[in-house]
Swiss-Prot record:
SUPFAM superfamilies: Alkaline phosphatase-like. NCBIfam families: alk_phos_PafA. The lineage of its organism: Bacteria, Pseudomonadati, Bacteroidota, Flavobacteriia, Flavobacteriales. This is Calcium-transporting ATPase. The gene is cda. Keywords: ATP-binding, Calcium, Calcium transport, Cell inner membrane, Cell membrane, Ion transport, Magnesium, Membrane, Metal-binding, Nucleotide-binding, Phosphoprotein, Signal, Translocase, Transport.
Amino acid sequence: MNFKSTVITAMCCFFSFAVLASEKLEKPKLVVGLVVDQMRWDYLYRYYDRYSENGFKRLLNEGFSSENTLIDYVPTYTAIGHSTIYTGSVPAINGIAGNDFIIQATGQNMYCTQDDSVQAVGGEGKVGQQSPKNLLVSTITDQLKLATNFQSKVIGIAIKDRGGILPAGHFANAAYWLDGKTGDWITSTYYMKDLPKWVKGFNKEKVVDQYYKQGWKTLYPIDTYVLSTADDNLYEETFKGEKTPTFPRDLVKLKKENGYELIKSTPQGNTLTLDFAKRAIENEQLGNNPLQVTDFLAVSLSSTDYIGHQFAINSIEIEDTYLRLDRDIADFLAYLDQNIGKGNYTLFLSADHGAAHNPKFFADQKGNSGYFDTKAIRKDLNEKLASKFGVADLVKSLANYQVHLNYEVIEANDVEEDEVIAAAIKLLKKVDGVAFVVDMNEAAESSVPQILRERIINGYNFKRSGAIQLILEPQWFSGSKDGKGTTHGSWNSYDAHIPAVFLGWGVKPGKTTRQTHMTDIAPTIAQILKIEFPNGNIGTPIQEAIEQ
């Protein structure tokens, strides 16, 4: 090689390195998390033929769907689900052991986002005394803030406080939730001292009253809702002021007895949430960050859960809600396309849990089901334990399908904890609807199927969970005889099989039917963003969903 060619080669290498050094790592402008509260996986397909092309169908056709995503723990509740999605962790690690839980060391009842050290901003009282303080690990939103030296903006929005606070994490710029007394969006002093002007402006518009004027009638002729039970039935709860749980509904009239709480249990609650999310994008410049870093908007749609609890999963109300939600999602995606740019954002849709059929409905179809009357069973359990040990009130609570012992009483009366647990287990095994009763001190050796054992251990936080875990038979849940509506909390597929759909920047379209987990969502987003996993993560990125 002569001198001239050597110089040319050296110069080429120099400029190649210079180009490489100047290359910028491409990332999406915005990540949007959509959690649809109480959305069973099968809702993606149950009403598929009635969905528009640009809502759920667009997510499925243009995005990646993990069709067999399961929840890794029991019990399956809202606060735990939101925490798990955003942390890739489970209650044993992240500390969120229920919507409410008991601090075992003190016996104190604790709401998942309760923080008495902060005050409401935009509202009054305990409704605003909320923060992520009780969450023990970082979220994917926290990790984004850390990765960008806190230059990214992170905002959480949900009608439910826990649905906005827990996903937004510890380092969020803001989390907003709805004050049911006023219909206003509020926050707490954990985030700020005063509401931004744009939030105050939105609240002044009294958007909820505008939605009430629309009423609630079915989107299509009611006789086309053939996938649902007849409108007037015994399985649904009425609103205050209603004689029957039937369409159409005059929301202005119902407001007189239900106030602004009413919006939570109507499809317009989802519309309200997404309208507020759009306003946040515009005013906070989410996805158009002047520092050119990725922002994160965590949205939870709470109304699907309120409606499901009140009317159950086979109702016309649920079918109509999802048909309307499909339109809302289509509108929101179109908004993102226009304002952030199609292909410039990454979005995922999932759920915090599913829901069971109403037990009476299921029994009327000749299925096995029933109600576990927690209040009556606790009373009976305490009476029988008192007869054996000579001490009253040994059981404090049966919350979260767990037996919480009254340790103050046990210690004061010098009763052996192990003996109380053994006696309680023996009694509970005789109760109708109980499949398994597990001593949490011996969970790893318990004689239950492995999949159940793993979920029980994952859901157990020894500082915040009960001493005994109850597993009920399928289609049994906590409630009184002939209870209306539905609930959730079990390990069964109707509660624990959830959607996990990814769309947009960094996502490879397609689907998989292999088993994945709720804990896989956060690390998947982390890998797309090329940032570190949350610090309590146990999940694995869904590689098939990621554009390499």
